[in-house]
């Protein structure tokens, strides 16, 4: 609603990354008060659109972590502005490789967790052949599904990250809904 953010503090500021606001308690915060835990009381459906990415100046909705919020629903009030950093072409390639390695491992771990009971059964029976077969099946499934979560930069993303900067590790993970058009030099 109009005026909601008037007088609200940016409670989370991380150099070369982002600044975040949205905690209504920040309007009456005392010095030293820990902020960031409260919000407006509702979430919004995720609207993650690949053409909107985390270049410098983008506004995006904050949210709880995937383990708590697998649907990636956005906070109804918390948002952040990307500060980010500028990457050289070589460094952006290294960053994308690191991001994709993490995403691959996370996907494999989720699939493995879904088979926890089966794994335990084979372990208790000392059935190492079945464990190896299951591991191969999980690895194959991970490779097949990975293409859906793999970060692939477009030419526009690569140009932005190597000129104005940003935070590519957030791409495909959060709802981007706006962009600062002037005033980022503050």
Regions found by a protein language model. Give the residues of each.
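Cyclophilin-like peptidyl-prolyl cis-trans isomerases
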Residues: 1-186
């Amino acid at each position: 609603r109009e005026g909601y953010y008037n007088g609200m503090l940016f409670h989370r500021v991380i150099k070369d990354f982002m600044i975040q606001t949205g905690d209504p308690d920040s309007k009456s915060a005392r010095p030293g008060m820990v902020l960031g835990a409260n919000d407006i009381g509702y979430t919004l459906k995720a609207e993650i659109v690949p053409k909107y990415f985390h270049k410098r100046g983008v506004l995006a909705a904050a949210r709880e972590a995937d383990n708590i919020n697998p649907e990636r629903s956005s906070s109804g009030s918390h948002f952040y502005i990307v500060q980010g950093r500028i990457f050289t072409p070589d460094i952006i390639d290294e960053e994308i490789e690191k991001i994709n390695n993490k995403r691959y491992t996370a996907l494999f771990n989720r699939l493995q967790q879904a088979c926890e009971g089966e794994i335990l059964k084979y372990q208790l029976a000392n059935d190492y052949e079945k464990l190896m077969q299951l591991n191969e099946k999980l690895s194959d499934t991970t490779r097949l599904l990975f293409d859906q979560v793999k970060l692939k930069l477009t030419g526009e993303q690569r140009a932005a990250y190597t000129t104005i900067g940003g935070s590519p590790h957030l791409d495909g993970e959060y709802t981007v809904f706006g962009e600062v058009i002037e005033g980022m030099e503050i």
